[in-house]
Amino acid sequence: MELTKIFLAFLCIGVSYSLGSFPSGFIAGKWLKGIDLRKVGSGSTGATNVLRHVGKKAALIVFLIDVSKGIGSILIAKSLFLSPSFHVICGIAALSGHIWPIWLNWKGGKAVATGLGVFLGISWQVGLASLGIFMAVLSSSKIVSLSSISAAISLPILMFLSLQEASFLNAYIIASFAAMIMVLWRHRANLKRLLNGDEPRIGKIN
């Protein structure tokens, strides 16, 4: 690989991480309510915690920004490199930035909205299908975390079904498993509450 391509590759990864780490939820909490979302509710800077402690309009804006961060990272990667493996690296960089933002002492969101954006960028069909699963579970359970976990678990299956020549070594399949693991890891506390039957539903403060 030429030095220029190496430079562009590292630049793209850095930009993807920076996009992912943009603290939209944190800014919304500070600007609109004067609160640090890392210290209230679930401690997440994602749209769900914004919904519970800032408001519906702010949560929608944060959600759209976070989705855009994921889409942007993939579009930039696709514009510079043809390799699916590199698209995956940039997508994971964006997810890592969202979960562990350097600007907020490594404490950010749970990668759901940004993950949706990443997979909309990789395969809009898979992204929309996972969103459909999220909405279906949310409609029946009224529990955001359960909906997020269900959508994350569906990703490898949806990606496998979407590829004509799928294998477990396919870069996008690997990405779907990586994203699933990251989302499940960030929902550890939610999983415990779900098992105990005390996970809050929409409209309740946790």
Curated annotation (Swiss-Prot):
Entry-linked InterPro entries: G3P_acylTferase_PlsY
Keywords, in A-Z order: Cell inner membrane, Cell membrane, Lipid biosynthesis, Lipid metabolism, Membrane, Phospholipid biosynthesis, Phospholipid metabolism, Transferase, Transmembrane, Transmembrane helix
Primary localization: membrane
Gene Ontology MF, one: acyl-phosphate glycerol-3-phosphate acyltransferase activity
Membrane topology of the entry: Multi-pass membrane protein
Top enzyme class: transferase
One cellular component (GO) term of this entry: plasma membrane
Pathway named in the protein's UniProt entry: Lipid metabolism; phospholipid metabolism
EC numbers, comma separated: 2.3.1.275
Annotated TM spans: 6-26, 57-77, 86-106, 118-138, 143-163, 165-185
Cell location: Cell inner membrane
Reaction catalysed by this enzyme: an acyl phosphate + sn-glycerol 3-phosphate = a 1-acyl-sn-glycero-3-phosphate + phosphate
GO BP annotations, alphabetical order: phospholipid biosynthetic process
Assigned protein family: Belongs to the PlsY family.
Family annotation (HAMAP family): PlsY
Quaternary data: Probably interacts with PlsX.
Task of the protein: Catalyzes the transfer of an acyl group from acyl-phosphate (acyl-PO(4)) to glycerol-3-phosphate (G3P) to form lysophosphatidic acid (LPA). This enzyme utilizes acyl-phosphate as fatty acyl donor, but not acyl-CoA or acyl-ACP.
Protein name, per record: Glycerol-3-phosphate acyltransferase
